[in-house]
Amino acid sequence: VAHRDEQGRVVTTGPGERIADLDALPEPAWDLFPVDAYLDRHQSGGVDRGRSMPLLTSRGCPYKCSFCSSPQMWTTRYLRRDPARVVDEIARYVERYSISNVDLNDLTAMLTKDWMIDFSRAMIDRGLEVSVQLPSGTRSEAVDAETARWLHRAGVRNFCYAPESGSAATLERIHKKVKLPRLRASLQAAIEAGLTTHASIIIGFPHEGTEELLETYRFVLQLALDGLDTVAVMVFAPYPGSEEYDRLREQGKIIHDERYFYSSLLRSAGATRSIHPRWSASELAALQLAFLLSFYGLAYARRPGRLAQVGRRVLAGRQESVMDQFLSTKLAQIMGGVMGGVMGGVMGRTEAAG
């Protein structure tokens, strides 16, 4: 905790002791918050599946990705809640707020097979008719065919993987403990179980060369062939407090200002400063676009029926994938602009006539 003393000096208390028993913590005091204003607008960290509540099942992450600040904030001690208590909380939200979806916003929501199956069984036993999304990404090691089937039966619909790179050298440099063949096997199991799958990719790591970038490009194309539904390709922007951020700031390659905090939230490479020693922001933006066009072009060429399904869902006002969400948002913006122009023209003619 940081605060100012009576003389106006900044005082920090240092790291607090970790709370080990997460089940002893009270639920968020949503009654003190205008939560219905968000539920009515279908605010969600994932796709629009109706009235969505955010929920945490754990704290921390046992991994140490170099671009993430979790090791510094939470350490690598991973603590999680009893799955039955998590389901109890979901049931209360269903009764109290009539929710239809839950977003598990954990740093690492699904880590062990036993926990996932216990959670699924509890959801099924309670008969809760809510969908579950994992918009923040999760590990693939414990998600096999059996686990994927349990998750789908329990209402899990959107599953996000976070390989970040298709280059073994890059994965080693960023301390990303992921085996790409294992991730692809997990992805296949999730697809066969009926889950809508998404993956996040990062390009533009300062140490990334052309060969590593091409390896990631080929991996993204392989995911398209494997049947991945959607992909997000983002430009490297390390979290403040992370290993990469602190190193680059010491080297003077990151300017610690408001623009960095703002631009790091944007998906467009053109809105960010390039940290890469060779590739400019505009070049990274072009690479980002090339990755996305290649993935979706190949994915829909391989499975053309999916594109028709996306179109039908968008026209029907339903969302099941990130692509549905993207196109629905763009359609709403276009329609809003058209209606604004029409109304502006009508008002202008009315004023002229008056």
For the regions a language model picked out, list residue spans one by one:
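Glycine-rich beta-alpha loop elements in corrinoid/cobalamin-binding modules
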Residues: 1-22, 241
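Basic phosphate/pyrophosphate-binding loop/patch that engages nucleotide-derived ligands
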Residues: 2, 6-7, 218-227
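Short, well-ordered beta-to-alpha junction loops that form the rim of enzyme active sites
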Residues: 14-17, 70, 107, 307
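Glycine-rich beta-alpha junction loops
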Residues: 16-19, 59, 108, 237
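Radical SAM [4Fe-4S] cluster-binding motif and immediate context
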Residues: 29-198, 203-205, 211, 215-218
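Flexible glycine/acidic-rich beta-alpha junction loops that bind and position SAM and/or redox cofactors
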Residues: 63, 113-114, 169, 173-174, ...
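Radical SAM enzyme core and accessory elements
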Residues: 243-248, 253-354
